[in-house]
A protein has these predicted regions:
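HIT superfamily nucleotide-processing domains
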Residues: 1-116
């Protein structure tokens, strides 16, 4: 399992940095965003370090699927049956600020379009 010793999310996976965990599996970890953009805002990450979603899909396609499985389970447990949004920001121009692949799960309010 690849890790980057300087990566904040790798440190969360290792338990070196605290986070409010809401879901864990053999390949994923999910925790609440510290700056939520919706009443429910959870980040789902692979335990392995990949800089973005494209790299994750190329390197561990099964783990990429596991992120979506985790997102569904989180949405159910958070009571988001009316709907929720899943977002990957990939690269600086897309406002990715932590370069460890992560899936945003947002819900608990009506979501407008376009998002940004």
């Amino acid at each position: 399992m690849a890790r980057d010793p300087d990566c904040l999310f790798c440190k969360i996976v290792a338990g070196d940095v605290p986070a409010e965990l809401v879901h864990e599996s053999a390949t994923t970890v999910a925790f609440r965003d510290l700056q939520p953009q919706a009443p429910t805002h959870v980040l789902v990450i692979p335990r392995s370090h990949y800089a973005n979603a494209a790299d994750l899909a190329a390197g561990e396609p099964e783990t990429a699927i596991h992120l979506f499985d985790a997102a569904r389970a989180i949405a159910e447990s958070e009571g988001l049956g009316e709907g929720y949004r899943m977002v990957f920001n990939t690269g600086p121009a897309a406002n990715q600020t932590v370069f460890h692949a992560h899936l945003h799960v947002l819900g608990g309010r009506s979501m407008g379009w376009p998002p940004g």
